[in-house]
């Protein structure tokens, strides 16, 4: 790794509809081939559907959904001697949010609904109600960390 100064984080501008940075970041994660307007339509539609069914504001629903997906712990591989251990480590706050967003998009794409909007809305609602594949992924990650608690002293 070069020993130069740390790279400055790029500032993500808030999205046009809700003026929220989290929504803007999620749009960027959903976006494929630079088609931002398509990603915006899909997310805004999904947020409206989810908010309608949950009976709350769209941004609140999305944030609660992401809070339910965010992992607190994860495992990292650490080589000690000849063997590799899965060492549980706490997840940094920025990484928590980005993992939650990635998992939300990934597991919404595996759903059986017809359109991307419906898939996203379904996964957002499931995560809002503490169900769904993305929440299961968080639980599995926590279980892995708990199972490997014996190796916690190898943390670096």
UniProtKB/Swiss-Prot annotation:
Record gene name: rpsG
Biological process, per Gene Ontology: translation
Keyword Transmembrane helix: no
Family: Belongs to the universal ribosomal protein uS7 family.
Subunit structure: Part of the 30S ribosomal subunit. Contacts proteins S9 and S11.
Alphabetical UniProt keywords: Ribonucleoprotein, Ribosomal protein, RNA-binding, rRNA-binding, tRNA-binding
Source organism superkingdom: Bacteria
GO molecular function, a single term: tRNA binding
Name of the molecule in the record: Small ribosomal subunit protein uS7
Stored InterPro entries: Ribosomal_uS7 (IPR000235), Ribosomal_uS7_bac/org-type (IPR005717), Ribosomal_uS7_dom (IPR023798), Ribosomal_uS7_dom_sf (IPR036823)
Protein's organism: Citrifermentans bemidjiense (strain ATCC BAA-1014 / DSM 16622 / JCM 12645 / Bem)
One Pfam family cited in the UniProt record for this chain: Ribosomal_S7
Its biological purpose: One of the primary rRNA binding proteins, it binds directly to 16S rRNA where it nucleates assembly of the head domain of the 30S subunit. Is located at the subunit interface close to the decoding center, probably blocks exit of the E-site tRNA.
Keyword hit for rRNA-binding: yes
SUPFAM superfamilies tied to this protein: Ribosomal protein S7
């Amino acid at each position: 790794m070069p020993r130069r100064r740390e790279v400055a984080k790029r500032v993500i501008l808030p999205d046009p509809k809700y003026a929220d940075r989290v929504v803007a970041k999620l749009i960027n994660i959903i976006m494929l081939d630079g088609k931002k307007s398509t990603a915006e339509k899909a997310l805004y539609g999904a947020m409206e559907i989810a908010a309608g069914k949950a009976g709350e504001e769209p941004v609140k629903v999305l944030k609660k959904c992401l809070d339910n997906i965010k992992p607190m712990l994860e495992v990292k591989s650490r080589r000690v001697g000849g063997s590799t251990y899965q060492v549980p480590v706490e997840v940094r706050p920025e990484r928590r949010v980005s993992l939650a967003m990635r998992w939300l998009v990934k597991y919404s794409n595996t759903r059986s609904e017809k359109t991307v909007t419906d898939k996203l809305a379904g996964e957002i609602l499931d995560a809002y109600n503490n169900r769904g594949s993305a929440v299961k992924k968080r639980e599995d990650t926590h279980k892995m960390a708990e199972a490997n608690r014996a190796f916690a002293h190898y943390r670096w």
